Amino acid sequence: MFDESYTIKNFDDVLFKAISDEKRRQEEHIELIASENYVSPRVLEAQGSVLTNKYAEGYPGKRYYGGCEFVDVAEELAISRAKLLFGAHYVNVQPHSGSQANAAVMMALLSPGDTFMGMALPHGGHLTHGSKVNFSGKLYHSVEYGVDSNTGLIDYDALEKLALQHKPKLIIAGFSAYSRILDWARFREIADKVGAYLMADIAHVAGLVAVGLYPSPVPYADVVTTTTHKTLRGPRGGLILCKENEEIEKKLNSSVFPGMQGGPLMHVIAAKAVAFAEALLPEFKTYQQQVLANARTMCSVLQSRGYDIVSGGTDNHLLLVDLINKGITGKEADAALGRANITVNKNSVPNDPRSPFVTSGLRLGTPAATTRGFKEREITLLSNWVADVLDNVHDETNISRVKTQVLLLCREFPVYA
């Protein structure tokens, strides 16, 4: 029997301190990693609930275990809300992550050795889009497309030529570091020319898609995948969507379970249901509008300070800063900003001469800062502080000054009041 007063404190002091330190770090640092966000206390409540105790292999109404009547409610809520959010006919909320969602789609639509196309990682793609160090580049034959070296934009004509040359069975449209709108119709046109499936990975922009601020790929793609965190502001997890296609739906279901996973994480699925309910509220669109406004403001300020932005701007929540003309590496910039309590991630830029462990760029995003309540005023201050640090990454006096300002702003805008 467990007493509900049992807590980590005074039981596991090392872990309790690590959690406490992380909570303080989140409150005292400004988060600019584009893939991170803060979930609501409601999402935390669901994810920390007793649903973590329940095994539920299978799908609602078709489980391999008894006692699933209440977790079925949670999963059905998550499914119905996701369908409403994205206008999808089919939804699978069971993938544990975006990577597993992508893997499940590939398993459903491809055979080992089949050819598929995805965006090159150094050009803004994702590991699961065909990187040779990832399962996607090992189990399948991946052909990478990229961006034009002059514009930083996807070269759709070059993409089409590659598709006609290699005849892929699947084309993945999606990114982890691309700041522009994807032309879903053009991707569909190219896929149709070679008889390929089209998969859209909207992990980064799902929240924007849900409220109509970024074009939806659902009408164009055969399958859509996403994470449930990032701009969607839910728990860390995956999601698969598609328009009506009974054959593909059956393949996807069996690919997720039993193909890729056993029992789903019912506490995470419940947290997804909560996040989807929050995303259906009017204020969620207001939040996403501010995310975009903040990203544009950050882009404008950094450009005015002499920093190059890949593609020349942003249409979404992120921007990729090219530091080559500044003579500093992404690794140096990441570390210096970290000392100022500004959290970012180093990132490769197109045709980067440096390794992925060093890089020549930074990826910045506004979802987490916007969740804190930052608007254009705060983002303008913050963007100038970023530039102040990057102007001289070795000036510790200046970095300390910026850190002091960051701490004051963080106290004004707590994450969890």
Swiss-Prot record:
One of its GO terms (biological process) is tetrahydrofolate interconversion. (6S)-5,6,7,8-tetrahydrofolate binds at L121, G125, H126, L127, S355, P356, F357. SUPFAM superfamilies: PLP-dependent transferases. Keywords: Amino-acid biosynthesis, Cytoplasm, One-carbon metabolism, Pyridoxal phosphate, Transferase. Catalyzes the reversible interconversion of serine and glycine with tetrahydrofolate (THF) serving as the one-carbon carrier. This reaction serves as the major source of one-carbon groups required for the biosynthesis of purines, thymidylate, methionine, and other important biomolecules. Also exhibits THF-independent aldolase activity toward beta-hydroxyamino acids, producing glycine and aldehydes, via a retro-aldol mechanism. Belongs to the SHMT family. Homodimer. This is Serine hydroxymethyltransferase. It comes from Legionella pneumophila (strain Corby).
